Amino acid sequence: MKKGCCLGVLPADLELEARLELARKLGFDGVEPNTLTRKADVQKLRKAAQNTGVQIIDVMNSAHWKYPLSSPRKRDRERSIKGMRTSLQNAHDLGSDTVLLVPAVVNDEVGYREAWSRSRAAIRRLIPTARKLGVRIAVENVWNRFLLSPLEFKDYVDSFDSKWVRAYFDVGNILMLGVPQDWIRILRRRIARIHIKDFDLKARQFVPLREGDVQWPEVRKALDDIRYTGWLTAEVRGGDEKTVRGISRAMDKILAGD
């Protein structure tokens, strides 16, 4: 497996290329940026990645919270689709094959049935772009009151009958709903990428890696069981070099099965 982190984990006071150099120095093979809306920023990141040898893991789509694909307002759904197309193009231009997408948000104005149908209709519209660019749409489990069981998540992904729609599994996000290693074994080959973070069930908050209630040895074993060889990306609170070094070391222990 390859080790990565979200770009925002790295010190914000450094220039972009220096941030990637630090990532490489501390043992990260890749970084995950958010959607870039300016071509100049895409070119800058691509050049920094080439100069440092750090890969772009995938692109985290940015429009899906402000403009959910499940919104009752067509205008918002269209904005979300447009933002996702930008993210898919970003990934292609940066040499990646995956974009993270939050598919829907269930709330007081959007019921579960509507979230399911609207998000599926929107993603179906995005599949031709994904296919053309060679970039997968990876649906992530987040705190959006949607896809609340591994069987449902599996069926949702399978409903598209397309290799361009996959799962982006977040280990820490799922802990209040279920057992991460169980979800991994059910989702299996559908998993395109994995976010890792840790969570304290008693305090009900995210905590540093290996300081919460995630059973990391069991998660590691489940990943071996499904023969996952892709990216593990730390989506955690970052900071200075010392903080990021600690994140890298914690990930090394997780990868070692400790």
Predicted regions and their residues:
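Glycine/Thr-rich phosphate-binding loops of Rossmann-like dinucleotide-binding domains
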Residues: D41, W65, E109, R204, ...
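Active-site-proximal loop/turn and secondary-structure-junction residues that shape catalytic pockets
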Residues: V9-P11, T35-T37, S62-W65, P103-N107, ...
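Histidine-acidic metal/acid-base catalytic patches
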Residues: M1-G4, V9-G27, S96, P150-R166, ...
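Active-site acidic/histidine proton-transfer and metal-coordination neighborhood
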Residues: D13, N51, S70-F169, I174-M176
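N-terminal pre-domain/capping segments
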Residues: M1-H92, S162, R189, R245-D258
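Residue-level detector of anion-binding/catalytic polar loops
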Residues: D29-G30, Q55, D97, R136, ...
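Conserved beta-strand positions in the central sheet of alpha/beta enzyme cores
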Residues: E32, D58-M60, L100, A138, ...
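Catalytic-core regions built around general acid/base machinery
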Residues: K44-T52, A122-K132, W183-I186, E218-A222
